[in-house]
Regions:
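Surface-exposed, low-complexity loop segments enriched in small/polar and acidic residues
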Residues: 1-16, 63-64
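Membrane-embedded beta-strand positions in outer-membrane beta-barrel channels/transporters
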Residues: 7, 17-21, 35, 72-76, ...
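Short loop/turn motifs that connect adjacent beta-strands in outer-membrane beta-barrel proteins
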Residues: 11-13, 27-36, 49-50, 146-156
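Residues that define the transmembrane beta-barrel architecture of outer-membrane proteins
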Residues: 14-18, 69-73, 133-137, 154, ...
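C-terminal beta-barrel architecture of Gram-negative outer-membrane proteins
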Residues: 36-150
Length: 201
């Protein structure tokens, strides 16, 4: 027994936005050389359109749902003076609506709170919990041993870093894990220290 099935693509996705980047070298260097860098993305529109044969087209809103935030980006400053280096950066993830929904009656009885988003999706309004915006910080400090240093550390770079400096927990979501691993996965381990050693031969 065999069966031949012809698949059809019945949905179209649309997304538009802007990517912004900035790199600036601060001109004065009395305390060392400072550099500023920023990379941000702005999502203007994001939706999906489904056209099922024999049925009316469906408009599915993807803006600020399931991790599709309007704003996302990072800004950081680095410093260098002699053999020393250091840096601090912040990573921002905007708010978005969770996939789980509640009823219009619950939304109304609660006084239409801001932590529930009212979104039009597939011809009806859905009421979703809002996962709040979050900012995490990373930092590092490093030192480069020169050719005149002790032979054990000569031409060696040492770098100590920390991820999620303030030890923030990932925001709560309705998924099985209680958070969104695709969006806030780096926050789950908490504050994480790193040590990097490299040597030039």
């Amino acid at each position: 027994l065999s069966r031949s099935i012809q698949f059809q693509n019945l949905a179209q996705s649309y997304a538009s936005g802007v990517d912004l980047s900035l790199a600036y070298q601060i001109p004065w260097d009395r305390l060392g050389k400072f550099a500023l860098a920023a990379d941000w993305s702005y999502l203007a529109r994001n939706y999906q359109r489904r056209e099922v044969p024999g049925g009316a087209p469906e408009f599915i809103e993807r803006m600020e749902t399931d991790g599709n935030t309007r704003w996302r980006g990072t800004t950081g400053v680095t410093w260098r003076k002699g053999a020393w280096t250091g840096g601090l950066s912040g990573y921002y993830i905007g708010r978005f609506a969770d996939s789980a929904t509640t009823t219009a009656a619950t939304y109304t009885n609660l006084g239409e709170p801001r932590y529930i988003a009212k979104q039009f999706d597939s011809g009806r309004f859905l009421y979703r919990y809002v996962v709040g915006e979050v900012i995490t910080y990373n930092a590092f400090a490093g030192y480069r041993f020169g050719r005149d240093a002790n032979p054990l550390v000569r031409n060696t770079n040492v770098r100590l870093g920390v991820v999620n400096l303030l030890d923030r927990d990932p925001p709560l979501t309705s998924g099985a894990l209680g958070y969104s691993p695709s969006v806030h996965g780096t926050m789950f381990p908490g504050r994480t220290w790193t040590l990097e050693l490299s040597r030039r031969f």
